């Protein structure tokens, strides 16, 4: 037996529907669309969320929340991610070059999560208290 000899068991697979191919198929003439009306026409689909003229759910419910523009240009970086950056001086640009943060980011804050394994110098980057203590314990320093 070879792969090209394999076939599904008889009766296990249904034949695909071919609408409009005779009354014996059960889908002749109108092709399962019924008589007249919007959905019987070609291209006659109804938009998602349309409720027949009743005010749709997504318009009945109130709006809420907003997107902070500050979140667009700020990023948080874990201590463990600093290992991805080559060199001892870490700046916003060096984090972008190492693909740790996105290209649109302008301000970065280092969070205490993971460990820092080498002494690094951070320039122009904000740091939490715990992260500052961990970096200084590893022999790192900060420049403004």
UniProtKB/Swiss-Prot annotation:
PROSITE patterns: RIBOSOMAL_L15 (PS00475). Residues 1-57 are annotated as: Disordered. Signal peptide: none annotated. GO terms for molecular function: rRNA binding; structural constituent of ribosome. The keyword rRNA-binding applies. SUPFAM superfamilies: Ribosomal proteins L15p and L18e (SSF52080). One of its GO terms (biological process) is translation. One of its GO terms (cellular component) is cytosolic large ribosomal subunit. The keyword RNA-binding applies. Keywords: Ribonucleoprotein, Ribosomal protein, RNA-binding, rRNA-binding. Residues 21-31 have a biased composition (Gly residues). PANTHER family: 50S RIBOSOMAL PROTEIN L15, LARGE RIBOSOMAL SUBUNIT PROTEIN UL15M. Part of the 50S ribosomal subunit. Binds to the 23S rRNA. Belongs to the universal ribosomal protein uL15 family. HAMAP family: Ribosomal_uL15 (MF_01341). This is Large ribosomal subunit protein uL15. It comes from Pseudomonas entomophila (strain L48). The lineage of its organism: Bacteria, Pseudomonadati, Pseudomonadota, Gammaproteobacteria, Pseudomonadales.
């Amino acid at each position: 037996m070879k792969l090209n000899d394999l076939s599904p068991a008889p009766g296990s697979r249904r034949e695909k529907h071919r609408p409009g191919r005779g009354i014996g198929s059960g889908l002749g003439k109108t092709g399962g669309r019924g008589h007249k009306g919007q959905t019987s026409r070609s291209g006659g689909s109804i938009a998602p969320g349309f409720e027949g003229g009743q005010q749709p759910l997504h318009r009945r419910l109130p709006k809420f929340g907003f997107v902070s523009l500050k979140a667009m240009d700020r990023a948080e970086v874990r201590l463990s991610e600093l290992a991805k950056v080559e060199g001892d001086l870490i700046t916003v640009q060096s984090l972008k070059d190492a693909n740790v943060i996105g290209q649109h980011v302008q301000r970065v804050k280092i969070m205490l999560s993971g460990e820092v394994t080498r002494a690094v110098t951070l320039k122009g980057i904000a740091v939490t208290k715990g992260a500052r203590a961990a970096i200084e314990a590893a022999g790192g320093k900060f420049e403004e």
